[in-house]
């Protein structure tokens, strides 16, 4: 471990040293230290030999030499000090100057030596002893030659020498200080170097740890990649399921839209039905008022009849009293009188109030109710009267009186009966006529089977009224009088004890179609000592067989006309077909039974099936009428179209003969952000964008008119660009395409005209569009995460514009799913191919490139298209997205070619190309403008619930 640490320290130190050696600052530092060392050596040299250079016995000449040497040393020291602060270039110059100064000094010394040799009278011997670091100059002067001048000069020189020594001492101190600073800085640098070495050691340890962690991270990254692949597979499966759910959702939204449309139609029809109902209600109310008036008149007649019957009964009682008197007077024959009294007692009871016996009331009934129930009891008078617990026996045949028996007594009432009968029959016939008219009117408006004959007998409502009266008071009712009019015999009805027997007897009697009112008057036996009589009027409603109960329209203003059961029944019958040209819409209408549920009366006799059948028959009749009118219109249109086609054929023949085509183009662009659809799709703003409108379009006509290209004119350039992840890429593409195609056409390497040498001009134009798309995509490298689809249409004419005979051509290139269609005659020609990631051919292309693709994959890195401009981040990953366009054939335009539709996928998600061509061609035949045609397609897209994207439409009329 120690060796490893030493090796690491040495390696770190060597690396640091090499790095310092390489740096320019370190080289300058080394140069400065070398110069400082040289200067220090020179100063030490002169300092050690100062006694030899500076002596008092030296001559002036020697002093001059010493001064020169000192000056040279001072200059050298000063120059060296300055050299430490300058750079390498200045140091080289100073070295050259030093060398030159040394040469000059040596020259001066030689010159002085020559002068001394010439001037000296006495010989002076200069000896040089070379010793390490010292030079001795021995001068021998003669004492005789010293003079005062020399002494003065020597003094001056000594002073100068002292000054120079002081300067040298100062410089030496400065150099010492500099050395101290250098020493301190060197120590600091060494300490820093040690710290750096320690840091390097720590960093190496950390580096080892990082290497280990990198290895671990690489292994984790590999695992994460595997997991990522699995997650992508799961994501693709989830996205496929999401697409399925979205398709279902779109289907449901289609159904919802159709349901809403049907609901609007139903509301309109319901409002019409309400208007009809209101008119019918008014008519019905008027007829009800008339019937009420008739009933009032009938009641008044019944009251008059009741009075007449009361008078008749009084007369009958008088006649009976007279007969009793006659019978009592005839006492001659006792046997006959006893038999007659017994029979009269059995037929007519005594009217004395002391006996408390009820008097049977003579009641006229119809022949239809002559068969009454009879109880097996005695025919005695006690059986008729009985007590409260005994049952009353029915009357025998002796109780019945024929009309011939009382012909003399009823002479007063017989003439009045036919009058009332005829009057009542008139009232009945008039009321039946009114009711029948009402039924016919309602059946005329609502259907022939609305009022159906009742299968069962009408239910009778019984009302009981108990009155305690005396036996002498005659008890009758209005209904009894009405029955008496239509009857021809008088019977006495038996009495019962309980109300249940009364109800059972009343319910057993059925009403015939001829009789309107029937009644049974029933007498109750006495209770206690007082005589009480209970009268129950069983009054049957006026109700003929085809008549239903009264219908009340009071709740027509309410919105809630359906209860839950009927609404479920109607919804179960509703079927909504998918979006199709030949779809059958079943209108959901509220039946009349639904309108009558909240009414005040019970309308159980009205069946829902009858009403549904009625509505269906009406709808079928309306549909048949509409179909007949449409067929007539279609026949007329077909005739007009045939005439137009004949004219067009003639014109086409003429145009084909002349080979002339209208060179002017009419076009229109319509676009919409479609915020509702985007909100429906839950889309949000892209980061950095202020709008959600990502569609951009161009329409340039005439294009390059000023350039005057050879053999080419009337060029039109039309394009739609649908951006994703923002509209930046679409904006760039819309600006780059016109510039790039202009460059390519001006280069001379591409041509749009026919070739006479047998070349393939279609291939030439395909090469033009391929290079155009590739150049634009290469200039969109900065759009890494943004992209767009592109659909570009070129329309041009061959030859110059002044030529009369010109042929026009059309060619389209696209990437993505913005489509274009050509309308030729009444047919649609698709000019583009949708490059979607879920397309089988695109999946096969990606597989052929060696890229794995799952069957459920519908997107490439979240993008729905497999070819686009931009998206260079995805393209660099090489996962299947390219920018190679689909190029259509070159189409020679003929007079049958009407227009071209270019639109983004927001339109094609709602309507297919064939339906769009059919929708717009009808407007084209009517002479509509391109603007109105584009507006029509835009509105159909935006109003659909399937539209969840921006919509851009270009119409080019050819």
UniProtKB/Swiss-Prot annotation:
This is Probable protein phosphatase DDB_G0282105. InterPro entries: PP2C (IPR015655), PP2C_BS (IPR000222), PPM-type-like_dom_sf (IPR036457), PPM-type_phosphatase-like_dom (IPR001932). Mn(2+) 1 binds at residues 722-723. GO terms for cellular component: membrane. It comes from Dictyostelium discoideum. Binds 2 magnesium or manganese ions per subunit. It is a multi-pass membrane protein. One of its GO terms (molecular function) is metal ion binding. The chain crosses the membrane at residues 2-22, 26-46. It is found in: Membrane. It catalyses: O-phospho-L-seryl-[protein] + H2O = L-seryl-[protein] + phosphate; O-phospho-L-threonyl-[protein] + H2O = L-threonyl-[protein] + phosphate. In the C-terminal section; belongs to the PP2C family. The keyword rRNA-binding does not apply. Mn(2+) 2 binds at residues 722, 905, 949. Its main location: membrane. Its cofactor is Mg(2+); Mn(2+). Residues 312-328 have a biased composition (Basic and acidic residues). The keyword Manganese applies. GO terms for biological process: signal transduction. Its EC number is 3.1.3.16. Residues 312-361, 380-421, 445-475, 491-525, 619-659 are annotated as: Disordered. Residues 329-361, 390-401, 452-475, 491-515, 619-655 have a biased composition (Low complexity). Residues 675-958 form the PPM-type phosphatase domain. Keywords: Coiled coil, Hydrolase, Magnesium, Manganese, Membrane, Metal-binding, Protein phosphatase, Transmembrane, Transmembrane helix.
């Amino acid at each position: 471990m120690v060796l490893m640490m030493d090796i690491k320290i040495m390696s770190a130190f060597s690396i640091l040293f090499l790095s310092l050696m390489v740096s320019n600052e370190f080289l300058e530092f080394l140069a400065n230290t070398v110069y400082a060392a040289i200067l220090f050596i020179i100063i030490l040299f002169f300092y050690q030999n100062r006694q030899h250079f500076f002596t008092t016995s030296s001559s002036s000449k020697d002093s001059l030499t010493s001064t020169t040497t000192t000056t040279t040393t001072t200059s050298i020291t000063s120059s060296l000090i300055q050299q430490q602060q300058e750079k390498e270039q200045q140091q080289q110059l100073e070295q050259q100057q030093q060398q030159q100064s040394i040469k000059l000094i040596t020259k001066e010394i030689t010159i002085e030596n020559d002068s001394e040799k010439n001037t000296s009278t006495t010989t002076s011997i200069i000896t040089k002893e070379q010793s390490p670091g010292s030079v001795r100059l021995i001068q021998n002067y003669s004492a005789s030659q010293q003079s005062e001048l020399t002494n003065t000069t020597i003094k001056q020189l000594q002073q100068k020498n002292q000054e120079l020594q002081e300067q040298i001492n100062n410089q030496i101190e400065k150099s010492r200080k500099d050395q101290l600073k250098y020493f301190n800085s060197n120590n600091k640098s060494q300490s820093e170097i040690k710290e750096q070495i320690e840091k390097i050691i720590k960093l190496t340890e950390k580096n080892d740890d990082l290497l280990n962690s990198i290895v671990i991270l690489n292994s984790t990254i590999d695992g994460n990649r595997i997991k990522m692949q699995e997650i992508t597979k799961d994501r693709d499966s989830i996205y496929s399921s999401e697409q399925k759910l979205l398709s279902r959702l779109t289907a449901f939204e289609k159904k919802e839209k159709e349901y809403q449309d049907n609901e609007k139609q139903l509301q309109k029809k319901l409002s019409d039905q309400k208007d009809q109902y209101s008119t019918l209600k008014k008519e019905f109310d008027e007829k009800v008022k008339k019937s009420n008036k008739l009933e009032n008149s009938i009641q008044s007649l019944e009251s008059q009849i009741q009075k007449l019957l009361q008078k008749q009964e009084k007369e009958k009682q008088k006649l009976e009293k007279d007969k009793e008197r006659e019978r009592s007077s005839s006492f001659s024959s006792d046997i006959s009188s006893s038999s007659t009294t017994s029979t009269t007692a059995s037929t007519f009871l005594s009217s004395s109030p002391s006996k408390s016996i009820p008097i049977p009331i003579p009641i006229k009934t119809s022949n239809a109710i002559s068969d009454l129930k009879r109880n097996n009891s005695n025919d005695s008078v006690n059986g008729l009267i009985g007590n409260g617990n005994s049952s009353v026996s029915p009357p025998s045949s002796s109780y019945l009186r024929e009309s011939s028996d009382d012909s003399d007594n009823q002479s007063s009432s017989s003439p009045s009966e036919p009058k009332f009968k005829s009057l009542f029959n008139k009232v009945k016939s008039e009321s039946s006529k009114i009711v029948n008219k009402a039924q016919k009117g309602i059946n005329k408006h609502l259907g022939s089977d609305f009022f159906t004959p009742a299968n069962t007998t009408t239910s009778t409502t019984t009302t009981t009224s108990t009155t305690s009266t005396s036996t002498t008071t005659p008890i009758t009712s209005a209904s009894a009088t009405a029955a008496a009019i239509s009857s021809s015999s008088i019977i006495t009805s038996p009495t019962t004890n309980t109300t249940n027997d009364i109800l059972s007897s009343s319910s057993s009697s059925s009403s015939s179609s001829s009789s309107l009112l029937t009644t049974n008057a029933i007498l109750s036996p006495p209770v206690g000592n007082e005589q009480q009589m209970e009268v129950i009027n069983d009054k049957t409603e006026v109700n003929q067989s085809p008549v239903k109960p009264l219908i009340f329209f009071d709740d027509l203003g309410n919105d809630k006309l359906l209860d839950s059961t009927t609404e479920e029944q109607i919804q179960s019958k509703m079927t909504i077909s998918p979006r199709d040209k030949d779809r059958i819409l079943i209108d959901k209408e509220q039946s009349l039974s639904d309108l009558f549920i909240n009414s005040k009366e019970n309308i159980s006799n009205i069946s829902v099936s009858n009403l549904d059948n009625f509505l269906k028959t009406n709808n079928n009749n309306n549909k048949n009428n509409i179909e007949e009118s449409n067929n007539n219109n279609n026949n007329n249109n077909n005739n007009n179209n045939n005439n137009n086609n004949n004219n067009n054929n003639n014109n086409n023949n003429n145009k084909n003969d002349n080979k002339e085509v209208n060179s002017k183009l009419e076009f229109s662009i319509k676009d919409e952000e479609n915020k509702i659809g985007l909100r429906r799709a839950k889309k949000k703003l892209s980061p950095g964008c202020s709008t959600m409108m990502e569609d951009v379009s161009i329409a340039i006509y005439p294009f390059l008119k000023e350039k005057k290209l050879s053999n080419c004119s009337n060029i039109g350039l039309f394009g739609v660009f649908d951006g994703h992840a923002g509209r930046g890429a679409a904006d760039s593409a819309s600006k780059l395409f016109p510039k790039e195609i202009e460059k390519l056409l001006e280069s001379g390497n591409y041509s749009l005209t026919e070739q006479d040498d047998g070349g393939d001009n279609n291939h030439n134009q395909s090469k033009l569009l391929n290079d155009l798309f590739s150049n634009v995509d290469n200039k969109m490298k900065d759009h890494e995460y943004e992209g767009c689809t592109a659909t570009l249409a070129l329309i041009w004419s061959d030859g110059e514009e002044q030529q009369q005979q010109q042929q026009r051509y059309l060619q389209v290139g696209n990437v993505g799913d913005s489509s274009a269609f050509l309308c030729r005659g009444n047919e649609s020609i698709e000019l583009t191919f949708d490059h979607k990631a879920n397309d089988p051919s695109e999946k096969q292309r990606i597989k052929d490139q060696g890229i794995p693709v799952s069957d459920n994959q519908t997107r490439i890195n979240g993008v729905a298209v497999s070819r686009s401009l931009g998206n260079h981040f995805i393209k660099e990953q090489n996962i299947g997205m390219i920018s190679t366009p689909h190029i259509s054939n070159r189409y020679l335009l003929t007079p049958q070619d009407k227009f071209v539709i270019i639109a983004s996928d927001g339109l094609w998600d709602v309507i297919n190309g064939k339906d769009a061509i059919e929708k717009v061609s009808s407007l084209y035949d009517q002479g509509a403008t391109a603007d109105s045609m584009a507006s029509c397609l835009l509105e159909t897209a935006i109003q659909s619930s399937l539209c969840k994207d921006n919509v851009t439409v270009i119409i080019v009329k050819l």
